[in-house]
Amino acid sequence: MGCLILVSGVPGSGKSTFCAKYEERGKVAVFSSDETRKQLTGSYTNFSREKEMWQTLYNNAYTILTRFPEMDVILDATYLSENQRLKVWRNFCEVADDLCLVQFQLDPNLARKQNESREKVVPGDAFDAMLAKFQPVTAEELNYYGSVVIVRNRDTREVLKYGNCSRHIDWL
């Protein structure tokens, strides 16, 4: 089976850019909460069907991991809290060969600036609320993920744990 790569970070931190670059390498399916929400509701900002959105996102990822073992899967969402990230681990730990966490910990001012210059702008007050909820990777999470990478900016990354999945993110 393939690896599951979970990207985490506030809006504008580079998650979707990372996913797009990874997708160019082939043999990967990217499932985005924003894109799934838009497919279901017609809008990135319509949160009326969140439960269905998450079920769809996870079902799609599960299908790829179980039917196409040569494929990797990336889940592109904010995953701001440890609880959110561990829920993903619990759902996929027996399905994926390895799970990798790539967390984007950019300077908040840079992330805010990048958020404001993208198509899917998160309003300032909502961005601030998300920033306040953001939890950096915890020591406990290192026990769960095979690989953990922190991206601080375009030129700086820190590998906290290097496992099987790392072969897929060495190019970062």
Regions found by a protein language model. Give the residues of each.
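Conserved substrate/cofactor phosphate-moiety recognition/catalytic segment
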Residues: 16-71, 112
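Conserved nucleotide-binding/hydrolysis micro-motifs of P-loop NTPases
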Residues: 35-37, 79-80, 105-110, 155-156
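Conserved beta-strand segments of the P-loop GTPase G domain that flank and frequently precede/overlap
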Residues: 74-76, 102-105, 150-151
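Conserved phosphate-donor/acceptor-positioning beta-strand/loop module used by diverse small-molecule
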Residues: 95-114
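Pre-Walker A (Motif I) flank of P-loop NTPase domains
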Residues: 1-5, 69-71
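Conserved beta-strand scaffold positions in the cores of enzyme catalytic domains, especially
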Residues: 28-30, 99-101, 147-150
